[in-house]
């Protein structure tokens, strides 16, 4: 007689992502167990306001080894750029825009790492670039969550890790203790009742402020054992808002130089930092800051003539963000206050849904998805992952972000401002600059107007 699987699903919103974990116990004939990544409702009912940029982060680090935090942040960044590059390859033929939240995916998988043993744990550790002991990893996450959950007049960031468990389903005490370090308190629900779907969707809707309102269907969780939720919400006003009266219809070009169509292009002239010669990148870099604290920014990379988005994504994977952020910081330090740049950028809305199982297997996380080899015994007995789903949405307009001819971003003569024309495919990353954490990343190939 064949095995009857019990499953666990993970879901992530504004991210929304999900991993479907199953039990291969032949004596257990109950319905699937699910893990979901969603929004920050219960864990952070009132995100803490941050003080001033770097000084706040330094205060959060006062009781934590800065070198360890930098090392772990670098690991998250390496995972993020690896994931971004692989998805870029996947979507190139479809010629579609996409957006992901690498930090939310990483955070969700860390919950599984905490529950894993043996080779499953080794594969997760290697892929997630975890290079420290568990206690230091947990400490780093506490620091991140403290300054990522912020609310000001110009920026709002909120995170959530949540675990819903079926009535009577056991979670091992050591795992329950471990996940408290990620601000997770398991919530017991009845996965056979429609009320569980209502609760998860309401949590997701509230955390993502309505961006991803109703993602879970009754059949997704019916009879589940566990549902893990990890989400990240971001809304930021540009430091230099675009003037709506200047927005105009302009052609947008494909990578081959063909006109895709006319779309609303925003125009702004301000003191933006830019870099045109990062060695090995093959792209021009522009920084669009959010708010007034100089902590969060959209980093835009426009491929140089003769190079494609996949080239840039592959180069970023090798280079990392550090040299780019250092070059941008050096530009800001030496640039005069009247060093203005003219930026033309499309308004766009991107909503994407990914099944990440194949990509994660490519990244070396194999045993997690194999009922014969998966080892999540620190969490509960006999589970394996069935599915990983990731849903995102981003809106970019004149106020900011809520998650002609083909031209290079060449510098004009000194009589006129340099021009950065984003009228052809480009890549963007929303970054917490002090740590280098890559919160969101995506590509615009065929924009839909906001």
UniProtKB/Swiss-Prot annotation:
The keyword Glycoprotein applies. GO terms for molecular function: serine-type endopeptidase inhibitor activity. Residues 1-24 form the signal peptide. It is found in: Secreted, Extracellular space. Pfam families: Serpin. Disruption phenotype: RNAi-mediated knockdown results in spontaneous melanization of the tracheal system in larvae and pupae. Displays melanization at the 2nd or 3rd larval stage and affected larvae die a few days after it first occurs. Melanization is first detected between tracheal cells and the overlying cuticle, then increases in intensity and spreads to the epithelial layer of the affected tracheal cells. Increased expression of the antimicrobial gene Drs in the trachea and fat body. SUPFAM superfamilies: Serpins (SSF56574). One of its GO terms (cellular component) is extracellular space. Keywords: Glycoprotein, Melanin biosynthesis, Protease inhibitor, Secreted, Serine protease inhibitor, Signal. SMART domains: SERPIN. Its main location: secreted. It comes from the Eukaryota. GO terms for biological process: melanin biosynthetic process; negative regulation of melanization defense response; negative regulation of proteolysis; regulation of immune response. Glycans are attached at residues 149, 205, 243. PANTHER family: GH21475P-RELATED, SERINE PROTEASE INHIBITOR, SERPIN. Belongs to the serpin family. Serine protease inhibitor which plays an essential role in regulating the tracheal melanization immune response to bacterial and fungal infection. Acts by negatively regulating a protease cascade involving Mp1 and Sp7, that functions in the activation of the Hayan-phenoloxidase (PPO1) cascade. This is Serine protease inhibitor 77Ba. It comes from Drosophila melanogaster. The gene is Spn77Ba.
């Amino acid at each position: 007689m064949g095995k009857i699987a019990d499953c666990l699903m993970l879901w992530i919103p504004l991210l929304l992502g999900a991993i479907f974990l199953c039990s291969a116990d032949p004596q257990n004939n109950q319905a699937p167990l699910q893990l979901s990544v969603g929004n920050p409702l219960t864990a952070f009912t009132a995100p803490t306001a941050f003080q001033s940029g770097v000084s706040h982060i330094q205060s959060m680090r006062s009781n934590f080894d800065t070198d360890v935090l930098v090392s772990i942040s670098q690991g998250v960044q390496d995972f993020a750029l690896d994931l971004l590059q692989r998805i870029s390859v996947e979507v190139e033929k479809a010629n579609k825009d996409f957006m992901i939240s690498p930090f939310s995916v990483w955070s969700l998988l860390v919950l599984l790492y905490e529950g894993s043993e043996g080779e499953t744990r080794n594969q997760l550790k290697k892929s997630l670039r975890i290079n420290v002991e568990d206690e230091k990893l947990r400490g780093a996450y506490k620091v991140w969550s403290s300054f990522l959950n912020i609310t000001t007049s110009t920026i709002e960031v909120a995170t959530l890790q949540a675990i819903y468990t079926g009535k009577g389903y056991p979670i091992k005490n050591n795992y329950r203790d471990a996940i408290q370090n990620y601000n997770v308190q398991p919530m017991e629900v009845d996965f056979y009742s429609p009320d569980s779907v209502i609760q998860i969707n309401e949590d997701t809707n509230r955390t993502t402020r309505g961006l991803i309102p109703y993602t879970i269907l009754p059949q997704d969780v019916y009879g589940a054992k566990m549902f893990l939720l990890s989400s990240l919400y971001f809304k930021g006003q540009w430091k230099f808002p675009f003037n709506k009266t200047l927005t105009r219809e302009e052609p947008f070009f494909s990578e081959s130089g063909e006109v895709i169509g006319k779309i609303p292009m925003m125009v702004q002239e301000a003191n933006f930092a830019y870099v045109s010669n990062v060695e090995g990148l093959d792209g021009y870099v522009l920084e669009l800051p959010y708010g007034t604290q100089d902590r969060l920014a959209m980093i835009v990379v426009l491929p140089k003539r003769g190079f494609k988005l996949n080239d840039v994504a592959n180069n970023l994977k090798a280079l990392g963000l550090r040299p780019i952020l250092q070059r941008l910081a050096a530009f800001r330090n030496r640039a005069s206050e009247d060093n203005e740049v003219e930026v033309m950028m499309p308004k766009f809305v991107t909503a994407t849904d990914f099944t990440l199982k194949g990509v994660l297997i490519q990244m070396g996380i194999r045993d997690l998805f194999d009922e014969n080899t998966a080892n999540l015994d620190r969490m509960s007995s006999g589970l394996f992952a069935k599915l990983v789903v990731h849903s995102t949405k981003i809106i970019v307009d004149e106020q900011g972000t809520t998650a002609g001819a083909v031209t290079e971003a060449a510098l004009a003569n000194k009589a006129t401002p340099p021009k950065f024309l984003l009228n052809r495919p480009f890549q963007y990353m929303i970054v917490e600059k002090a740590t280098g954490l890559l919160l969101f990343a995506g590509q615009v190939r065929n924009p839909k107007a906001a």
